């Protein structure tokens, strides 16, 4: 995630020449103070103050410059005074970076004894931002609005959350996804229009032969494998058969070789997300379980069975949640515990669940895998942390992409499961099991999802809105009749 350190957000402050030089100097001084304060609080992305925007020509020049500045991830616009919005038409029409409208004002409180018309003219965000907001709406331009005083903790949190989405948007527009093999045969939802995805999101998806990956795996040096195995021993609880001298020790060494070869291939090609499928493993000793789990923990996106849309979304949410404590993972609704009025989803996958979500130190084990026809694969076994969470997916409906995000309550495991050989999570659906399940299925939600304990639906909505894709939110107040209407209306709106 080193690229995040290079990013910047441009702060554009609107006014007009009508107020005169002294007032404009004060506007800029106030904007500079706000910028310095926000940057002093370690924002996710640093803010760069630009010259005042007081004429149509100024605004157009700044917006064009933002488009062409590679490291500019987005733009914050604030109307300190009134800034006639027709001046903003040319610039906003051309701006293609994410936009945040910052509805704040320099002074937190009205100076009751001193306030006069000079003060009123200088501090006009209350109606200056309404003028600006009208034009953004008139142009049908997506934007995030943050309301509140610039020194408040809630504003800092809102700005940081928006910046995290910016980083994910930036990354998607530069992302390369590698596919090893094709889709799992006859599976529908993992298919999709890769050309349209590149047009809409910016990321590219290309396929590579398993032999190319195998060549990379076979080129790994023995000393590098030994170093990685020591890392395994330090980070995880190894079962006896994988410890030095154990009867399955060679399988652990093979896993290390696969991990290093896979990472080398991805890094050489600049890929930050990838897919594989158990039906295309020619030349490999085992399906990559542990290697995929560890690469996800390092920030790579992943989708099983050729699911490139989910691989890209895992990567996006990995970027959004960089530095946060609870993790996210590729995931699948697997089976249910249907106790009356206490239904629980057991979510997992064959192998590939990211240990960033683990509650405790994972167990590194080796177990048979009934599909794929290869040697027993190593894998990390653990239970997810508990807490508020989301499950998200993107599906291709033929004429558009739809993102679906469901709010969840991840819970501690109800009972021990000594024979379950995979990483897993337990959750309860919002608003209840029946409604939440029906809502996901009605919306066409995939059987794969991205499970996150850090990223909420509002952030994912912002992500979807920027790319102009449909967003369906399943939450504690979801009513099926309302959802059916929303889906019906969206079919018309997105034609």
From Swiss-Prot:
Pathway note: Carbohydrate degradation; L-arabinose degradation via L-ribulose; D-xylulose 5-phosphate from L-arabinose (bacterial route): step 1/3
Q: Which reaction does it catalyse?
A: beta-L-arabinopyranose = L-ribulose
Tell me which InterPro entries the record gives.
Answer: Ara_Isoase_C (IPR024664), AraA_central (IPR055390), AraA_N (IPR055389), AraA_N_sf (IPR038583), Fuc/Ara_isomerase_C (IPR004216), Fucose_isomerase_N/cen_sf (IPR009015), Lara_isomerase (IPR003762)
Q: Supply one GO molecular-function term.
A: L-arabinose isomerase activity
**Cofactor: how and how many bound:** Binds 1 Mn(2+) ion per subunit.
Leading EC class: isomerase
Isomerase in keyword set: yes
Q: Which HAMAP family match?
A: Arabinose_Isome
**Name assigned to this protein:** L-arabinose isomerase
């Amino acid at each position: 995630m080193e690229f995040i350190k290079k990013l910047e957000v441009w702060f554009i402050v609107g006014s007009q020449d009508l107020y005169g030089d002294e007032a404009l100097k004060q506007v800029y001084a106030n904007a500079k103070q706000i910028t310095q304060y926000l940057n002093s609080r370690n924002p996710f992305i640093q803010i760069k103050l630009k010259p005042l925007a007081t004429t149509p020509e100024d605004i157009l020049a700044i917006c064009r410059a933002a488009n062409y500045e590679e490291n500019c991830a987005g733009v914050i616009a604030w109307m300190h005074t009134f800034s006639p919005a027709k001046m903003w038409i040319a610039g906003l029409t051309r701006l293609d970076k994410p936009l945040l409208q910052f509805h704040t004002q320099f002074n937190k409180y009205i100076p009751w004894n001193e306030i006069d018309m000079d003060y009123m003219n200088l501090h006009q965000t209350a109606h200056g931002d309404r003028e600006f907001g009208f034009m953004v709406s008139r142009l049908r331009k997506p934007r995030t609005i943050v309301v509140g005083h610039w020194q408040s903790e809630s504003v800092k949190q809102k700005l940081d959350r928006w910046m995290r989405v910016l980083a994910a948007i930036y990354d998607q527009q530069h992302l390369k996804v590698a596919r090893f093999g094709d889709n799992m045969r006859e599976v529908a939802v993992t298919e999709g229009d890769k050309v349209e995805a590149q047009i809409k999101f910016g990321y590219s998806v290309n396929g590579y032969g398993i032999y190319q990956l195998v060549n990379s795996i076979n080129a790994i040096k023995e000393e590098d494998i030994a170093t990685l195995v020591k890392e395994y021993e330090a980070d995880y609880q190894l079962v006896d058969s994988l410890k030095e001298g154990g009867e399955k020790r060679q399988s652990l060494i093979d896993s290390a070789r696969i991990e290093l070869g896979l990472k080398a291939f991805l890094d050489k090609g600049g890929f930050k997300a990838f897919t594989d499928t158990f039906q295309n493993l020619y030349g490999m000793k085992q399906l990559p379980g542990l290697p995929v789990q560890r690469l996800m923990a390092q920030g790579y996106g992943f989708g099983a069975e050729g699911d490139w849309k989910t691989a890209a979304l895992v990567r996006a949410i990995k970027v959004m949640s960089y530095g946060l404590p609870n993790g996210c993972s590729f995931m699948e609704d697997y089976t249910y515990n249907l106790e009356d009025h206490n239904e629980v989803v057991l979510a997992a996958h064959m192998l590939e669940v990211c240990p960033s979500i683990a509650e405790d130190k994972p167990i590194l084990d080796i177990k048979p895998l009934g599909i794929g026809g290869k040697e027993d694969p190593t894998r990390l076994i653990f239970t997810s942390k508990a807490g508020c969470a989301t499950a998200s997916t993107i599906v291709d409906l033929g004429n558009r992409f739809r993102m679906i995000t469901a709010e969840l309550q991840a819970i501690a495991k109800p009972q021990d499961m000594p024979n379950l050989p995979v990483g897993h999570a337990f959750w309860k659906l919002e608003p209840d099991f029946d409604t939440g399940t029906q809502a996901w299925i009605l919306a066409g939600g995939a059987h794969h999802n991205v499970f996150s304990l850090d990223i909420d639906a509002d952030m994912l909505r912002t992500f979807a809105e920027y790319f102009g894709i449909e967003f369906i939110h399943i939450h504690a107040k979801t009513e099926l009749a309302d959802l059916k209407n929303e889906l019906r209306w969206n079919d018309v709106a997105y034609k």
